[in-house]
């Protein structure tokens, strides 16, 4: 039976950002999962590897989001948002504002793109 190529997308850079404590999403969870995988030898050898995400380029982000939304997200990341941002869901309970949220989002989106490209290229079966 052929072993599957598995890639874990992670960077310590992701741990620099934090959702508000009352939000259920915790960016530290990925670090803890990585520690468990690493302690069990599941991140290297036998078709397994770890790859760091790269920030998604704005031109790629604009294929999925309007320039207006990206600007609102960037502005909110600096602690400023308004009614228009709220209308787009920025600053709500589901998408709370936090310092560096734009940078985190760009890196997380980039990680998704890295994973998709690894799978499409055949360099990974699972990412």
Q: Model features per residue range: what roles?
A:
Residues 1-127:
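HDAC/HDAC-like amidohydrolase catalytic core signature
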